[in-house]
Amino acid sequence: MERASLTRSSINPKSNSNLNPDSVEFGYISGYNLRISCQNNISMTAYNLETLDGERYEAQMNLLFLHKLSEKFKNLKAINNIYSYIVKLIKEGNYKIISSPPNIVLVLQITENIENSNEIKIVLSSINRKYGNFKYLQEYLEILTNEIKRIKNSGSIVEKLENENKKLKKEVTDLKNIISSSSNNNLQNSKNNNININKNMIALDEFNKKFGLKIPNNNIKKLDLDNLNLGNEIIDYLAGMNFPFLEKLYIANNDISDIKNIEFFNYNNLQKLSLVDNKISDISALEKCHFADLKELHLYNNNIVNIKPLENSDFSKLQILSLGNNKISTIIFSKFNFVDLKALFLYNNSISDINTLSQCDFKNLEKLALNNNAIEEISVFEKVNFKNLKELWLYNNNISDIDVFSKAKFFNLEVLSLSNNNIENIKTLEKCDFRMLKKLDLGGNKISDITVFAKVNFNDLKELHLFNNNIDNIKILEKTNFDKLEKLVLNDNKIKDINVLSKVNFKNLKILYLYFNKLESIDVLKQTKFPLLEELSIGGNKISNISCLAQTNYINLKSLYLYNNDITDISILSKVNFPHLKILSLRHNKLMNISVLSNTNFTELNNLDLSENKLKEIDIISEVKFPELKELFLYSNSLTDLSVLKKVNFERLNILSLQENKLNNINFLEGVNFPALIKLYLDNNDIEDISALKTAKFPQLEELSLAKNKIMNISVLIRVNFPELKILYLNENKIKDISSLEKVKFDKLQILYLNDNLISNIQVLEKINFLELNELWLYNNNIEDINPLKKFKIGKIQVLSLFGNKIDKEKFANTIKSMQESIKNFQLTEVIY
C-alpha cells in the first residue's frame, strides 16, 4: 500500500514546494497523458479518484481558488468559463514559465480582482498510462496544451510536443506499411484471416515472423489495433482501405478524438466495432456510416456527451450498444430503431432523467445498465415494454422510491441491482411479479424492515444481498419461501441475533455473509441445515466461542472467515469436519496458542491467515499436514524465532508474510527450500543481517520486501540466486553503500526501492545492468552528485524518484536532458523530484 501511495500520487508536494521563478530550464513532458494540478499560496486539497479498475489515485486541485473563480462567473459548474479565462490569460501574454523537472509550471497573472489571489500556478507533469487517466481533467488539458503551442518564446515546450507527435506519426507510418504490405498479390493462399498488431511489431518481417501471416486485404475478417496510441490518423488511414470481408475491428486505446472520416469506412460486413478508451466526444459521423450488419458497437470510456446521432444511424441489426463511462446527461432516442438490441450499457455517466426511454421499443432488450449515474426517479419503467429484460442494473444512483416495480411488467427479470441508493421502504416488493428473479441486490441502502420477504413470491431467488443497511432483526427469514437460495449477504448491519437460521429451509445455501454485525454468539450454527454451505464469513463481530463448529454439518465448507473477533481458543478445530476447507482466516483475534493445528484434517487448505494475533512462537507448524498450502500470513505478531521453517515442507507455498514481528535476523532462511515461493515479506522487523539469503532456495521468488529494518550491508545480494526476482524493497533501512549492486544478478528486476536510506554515492549506477528495470526509487537520501545518471544503462526505466536529496535543480535538469539526448529509446515518463 505504501508503494501505491507513492507511485500514484498526482503531484508530490515536496517536488513543488520551492519553485524558483528565475529557473527557466527545459521542462519535461513525455507520453500522452499529463497530470494537472492547480495550486496557489492559499490552500491545496487532495482528492481521491476511483477508476474503473477499482484502483484509487490522488489528484490535487486548489478547490478554494476554483471556487472563487467560479463565483466570479456566477456558476459553480461553469468550468468551461474557467478554462476560457485561463486561455485568455495565456493569449494576452499574462504568464511566465518556470520549471522543476519534470514539471512545467505556467504562472498566470490574474487580471481581474479575485480576493487575495493574483496568480494561478498550473503544474503539468508526465504520467505513465498504467497509473491512471483522469478523464475529467482532459478537456482542461487539451485546451491548455493547444494554447501553449501558439505561445511565442516557449519553443522548448512546443519542440517537445512536436517530438511526441513525430513518434506517433512514425507508428502510424509503420502501421501503414504493415497493412499495405499484406495486400501483396503473392500472399493469396493463406487461410489466416485475423490480424493483431501491437507496439512490438513495427516491421513487416517481425510481423510475419510472429504470426506467419501472408494475406491480402480482401481476406481479413478481424483487425486488432488496440493499445497503439495511433491517434486520429488511424481513422483517416482506415477510411482509405478496402476490407470487404472484415467482421471485427478493434481500435481501442489509441488516443483518438476525431472520427469524422469513419463514414468512409468501406466495411460492409462489419459486425463488431470497438472504439473504447479513446477521447471521442463527437459521434455525429456515425449517422453516415453504412454498417448494415453491425451487431456490436462499443464506445465506453470516451468523452461523448450527445448520443442523438445514433437515432439516425443505419444500425438496424445492432444487438449490443455500450456507452458507459462517458459524459452523457441526456438519453434522447425518439427515433430509436434498434429493434434487435439486446444489451444497452449507459453506466458511469451523468444521467439524471430517463423518461425518454418511454419513446423506445425495447421488446428484445435483455440487459440494461444504468448504474453509477444521478437517477432519482424511475417511474418510466411502467411505460416501457421490457417483456424480455433479464438484467437491470441501477446501483449507485439516488433512487429512493421503487413503487414502480409493482406496476412494471418484468416477467423475465432475473437480476435486479439497486444497491447503494437511498431506499428505505421495500414493502412494494410484495406486489411485484418477479417470477423469474434469481438475484436481488438491495445492499448499501437505508433499509431496516425486511418483513416484506414473507409475502413475496420469488421462488427462483438464488442471491439476496442486503449488506450495509440498518437491519437489526432477521426473524422474518423463517417465513420466507427461498428454497433455492444459494447466497445470503447480510454483512455490515446491526444484527445481534441469528437464531432464526435454525428454522429456515435454505437447503441450497452455499454462501452466508454475516461479517461486521454485532454477534456475540454463533451457537445456533450447530442447529442449521446447510449441507451445501461452501463459504461462511462471521468476521468483525464480538465472537469469543466457536465450539459450535464441531457440531455443524458443513462438510462442503471451503472458506471460513473468523477474523476480527475476540477468539482466544481454537482447540475445537481438531474436531470439526471440514474436509474440503481451503481458506481459514483467524486474523485479528487474541490467539496465543495454535498447537491444535497439528491435529486438524485440513488436507486441502490453501490459505491460512494467523496475522494480528499474540503469537510468540509457531513451532507446532512443523507438525501440521497442509500439503496444499499456498499462502501463509503471520504478520503483526510477536515472533522472534522462526527456525521451525527449516523443518516444514510447504512445496506449494506462494506467499509468506512475516512483516511487523520482532525478528532481528533471518537465519531461519538458511537452506530453506520453498520451490514455489513467489512473495516473501519481511518488512518492519529489527533485521540487521541478511546473509542467510545466500543459501535460501527460492527459484520462483518475484517479490522480496526487507523494508523498514536496520539493514546496513547489502553486499550479500551478490551471492543471492533469485533468478525470477522482479520487485525488491530495501527502503527505510540504514544503507549507505550500494556499490555491490554492480555485481548483483537480478536479470528480471523491474522495481527497486532504495528510498529513505543514507545513500550519498550513486556511482554504481554507471555499472549496474538491470535491463528490465522500470522504476528506481532513491528519494530521501543524501545524494548530491547525479552525474552517474548520464551513464546509467537505463534499459526500460520509466520512473525515477529523487526528491528529498541535496541535488542542485539546474544540474538535475541538464542531466535529465543529457540522458534523453543520448538514449534513442528513452522511455522515462516520470521523474519525481
Placement of each model-derived feature along the sequence:
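A structural signal for beta-rich interaction modules in eukaryotic proteins
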Residues: 2-119
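Conserved hydrophobic beta-strand positions in leucine-rich repeat
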Residues: 223-225, 249-251, 271-275, 295-299, ...
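Heptad-repeat coiled-coil/leucine-zipper oligomerization helices
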Residues: 140, 147-150, 154-157, 164, ...
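Leucine-rich repeat domain C-terminal region
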Residues: 775-780, 793-833
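LRR N-terminal entry segment and analogous cap-like coil->beta motifs
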Residues: 192-258
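A structural signal for leucine-rich repeat
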Residues: 236-242, 260-267, 284-291, 308-315, ...
